[in-house]
């Protein structure tokens, strides 16, 4: 049976912390930013650590990490 390949898009979008949690970019910053409050834009800057359950799903289904 051939090797299962990792999801290419997921490899680019998610990173792991040293403790095994998953980091991702904040969503909702592609367009229409002039209508958004400054606080919302500021909070969407940088990366955030996903909830543990969501991170486990990403790792299992897309990145093939157990």
From Swiss-Prot:
GO terms for molecular function: structural constituent of ribosome. Gene3D superfamilies: 4.10.410.60. It comes from the Bacteria. Signal peptide: none annotated. Residues 28-44 have a biased composition (Basic residues). Keywords: Ribonucleoprotein, Ribosomal protein. It holds the Pfam family Ribosomal_L35p. One of its GO terms (cellular component) is ribonucleoprotein complex. GO terms for biological process: translation. Residues 25-45 are annotated as: Disordered. Belongs to the bacterial ribosomal protein bL35 family. This is Large ribosomal subunit protein bL35. It comes from Rhodospirillum centenum (strain ATCC 51521 / SW).
């Amino acid at each position: 049976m051939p090797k299962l390949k990792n999801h290419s898009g997921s490899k680019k979008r998610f990173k792991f912390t040293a403790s095994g949690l998953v980091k991702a970019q904040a969503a909702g910053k592609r367009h229409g930013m002039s209508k958004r409050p400054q606080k919302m834009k500021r909070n969407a800057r940088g990366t955030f650590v996903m909830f543990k359950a969501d991170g486990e799903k990403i790792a299992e289904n897309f990145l093939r990490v157990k």
